[in-house]
Regions:
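A short, structured loop/turn motif at beta-sheet edges
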Residues: 33-38, 93-98, 133-142
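Signal that preferentially marks extracellular ectodomain short beta-strand elements
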Residues: 47-53, 119-136
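Beta-strand-rich interaction surfaces with strong enrichment in secreted/lumenal proteins
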Residues: 27-30, 78, 130-133
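Cleaved targeting-peptide boundary
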Residues: 18-28
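Structured domain cores in non-transmembrane regions
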Residues: 55-124
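Bacterial N-terminal signal peptides
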Residues: 3-16
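Short, well-ordered beta-strand segments enriched in hydrophobic/aromatic residues
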Residues: 38-50
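Glycine-rich, aromatic-bearing surface loops/beta-hairpins
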Residues: 137-210
Length: 210
């Protein structure tokens, strides 16, 4: 009987893992901006669970957090954290207008379907993450990016549920790559893409994070 119970629990856990929502970070670009700094762009494959779809359709606000870090490796001490920044989006549904609303900062966009809202959320574009005076041409840094559902912004009852329910665990792994500052001036190479400045860690120089 104990063996049967364990099998049932294992199958239930396996099913939960198979259907858990997730985010995958793809096509990262860290490129020079017109003002001499650097902007980050990436695509996110966001897999919503039915529980999250139901929650937002019933009026619960969901907050998504993109986090970016840039570190300078130091062989003699801990790595120096050069940049640690984030960007937040708020996803809501308004029953009166039957529209989904996606907000970040002062920007607000409305959509007729959840899929449309998620498509926009999945496209991270031209995020200013690094000033030109923080780095020197030819320097290399460890870069990392992830996106996740910020469960700390949920109402307390949902925060408690999120602790034990995988339906609320919506997050990517940290996507890490090696970023090398172009030797040419950022202003002269504003059209350059990440393929010239970003390399996945453990990949040959000049590659791109996928």
């Amino acid at each position: 009987r104990l063996a049967d119970t364990l099998i049932v629990l294992f199958l239930a856990l396996t099913s939960a893992l198979a259907t858990a929502a997730e985010i995958e970070v793809r096509n990262i670009q860290l490129a020079p901006a017109d003002d001499g700094g650097y902007v980050l762009s990436a695509d996110m494959a966001i897999d919503f669970s039915p529980r999250l779809e139901e929650a937002v359709s019933k009026g619960l606000a969901l907050y998504f957090l993109a986090e970016f870090e840039l570190s300078r490796p130091r062989w003699y001490w801990f790595d120096e954290k050069l940049v640690k920044t984030h960007q937040t989006w708020r996803l809501t549904y308004h029953a009166l207008t039957r529209q989904y609303r996606l907000s970040t900062g002062a920007l607000h966009q409305s959509f007729s379907s959840l899929d449309e809202a998620l498509r926009v959320l999945s496209r991270l574009r031209n995020w200013q993450v690094l000033a030109a005076d923080r780095v020197l041409p030819g320097e290399s840094f460890d870069a990392a990016l992830r996106m996740r559902l910020d469960t700390t912004q949920l109402p307390k009852p949902f925060q408690i549920e999120a602790i034990s329910n995988r339906d609320w665990i919506l997050s990517s792994d940290w996507k890490r790559w090696l970023f090398t500052v172009p030797v040419v001036s950022p202003a002269a190479s504003s059209a350059a893409t990440a393929t010239t400045v970003s390399t996945p860690i453990a990949a040959p120089a000049g590659g791109e994070a996928k």
